[in-house]
Amino acid sequence: MKIETLPAEFEPARPILSRIEEAGFEAYFVGGCVRDTILNLPIHDIDIATSAYPAEIKQIFSRTVDTGIEHGTVMILDHGTGYETTTFRTESGYQDFRRPDSVTFVRSLKEDLQRRDFTINALALKEDGTVVDLFDGLGDLKRHLIKAVGDPAERFHEDALRMMRAARFAAKLGFQIEPGTLAGMSQNAALLEKIAVERIQVEFEKLLLGKAVQNGLAAMLDTKLYLHCPGLKEGGQGLQYLAQQPLTLNNATQAWGALAICLGLDKNQLRPFLKGWKLSNGLITAVSRAVPLVEKLTTKTAGASDLYQAGQQAVADAVVIANSLGGQVDPQAVQAAYQALPIKESGELALNGGDLIKAGVKPGPAMGKALTTLTKQVVEGQLANDYQTLLKAAGELLKA
């Protein structure tokens, strides 16, 4: 197969391949950029593999940086944008089921490609657009199959995270996992516990945001991979329910929020679950704001205070989550209700703690409680957001 017109993203990198070839070595675009080009998907990273050893690359190009030279990776800066080239290599000894104990540089493209995870990622692309396919990756793209290169068990023992990647690609591309590869995932699912939670989390989040979430979740359920993920040992039914929903999730907050609701987590379980996945504090806060609002939006019981406490972004996320789980929430109506709030954050209240101190009120819990009550009354339209009105109301509250 030959791609007559390469996407524009490749153009700045093509001179690098030409220079390497002119020096007598092989060089190819490899991995996801080749797969996504063939599938007409957006291209993210341009990866280059070469038969030239790192020292030889540094002789060919004048401006280089050793970004991972022990693994054969050198960044070339000669053409402005930095591009990483990695020497063809074989790997051996995966004691942690993630990283090789040793790397050996080789001159053979086949030896390099056969260590890769899936056939659809083991494609190479020449500078002239010719696709090199040594493991029928093109056939598997046509068949919409995710298939391990060689023996699935070997690939998963080399890197147990590949099992999550298989499920993630199923969700992202809408592909099925080849039966032998799926069986290999079932047999080796427990190895996932050897992998850092943060790495599993990245793949799982991408899965939840895929266009075919159902495919990815089905793979996790069929292989029992989910049993080896944080907080999901009792989550089989919740994942099945999630897989049946008309999901249209757009960001991480929505993804984790929808998952939490389908798992039936209550307010006391939510934060520990999210922390177990090693999510950032900011994301945990965002999910914790959105989730309580979802049920209220779905049951039409969300009031002004609920919208105020959630904040604009959480309100928007909650609407998407609700509708992704089969709700009938009108986004425009909810947004209009939010915009109609008299104030949208505490700083907009016409009276603050400093004003009360000037008026002779002693700082303390009573003052804080009074300001909270005033805020609620303004949000709910019971009081005008006016300095004199609020000062008078505060005085009455503090006398009580």
From Swiss-Prot:
EC top class named in words: transferase
Pfam families documented for this protein: PolyA_pol, PolyA_pol_RNAbd, tRNA_NucTran2_2
Catalytic activity: a tRNA precursor + 2 CTP + ATP = a tRNA with a 3' CCA end + 3 diphosphate; a tRNA with a 3' CCA end + 2 CTP + ATP = a tRNA with a 3' CCACCA end + 3 diphosphate
EC number: 2.7.7.72
Superkingdom of origin: Bacteria
SUPFAM superfamilies xref list: Nucleotidyltransferase (SSF81301), Poly A polymerase C-terminal region-like (SSF81891)
Cofactor(s) listed in the protein's UniProt record: Mg(2+)
Family affiliation: Belongs to the tRNA nucleotidyltransferase/poly(A) polymerase family. Bacterial CCA-adding enzyme type 3 subfamily.
Other remarks on this protein: A single active site specifically recognizes both ATP and CTP and is responsible for their addition.
Name this polypeptide is given: CCA-adding enzyme
Organism of this sequence: Limosilactobacillus fermentum (strain NBRC 3956 / LMG 18251) (Lactobacillus fermentum)
Lineage: Bacteria, Bacillati, Bacillota, Bacilli, Lactobacillales
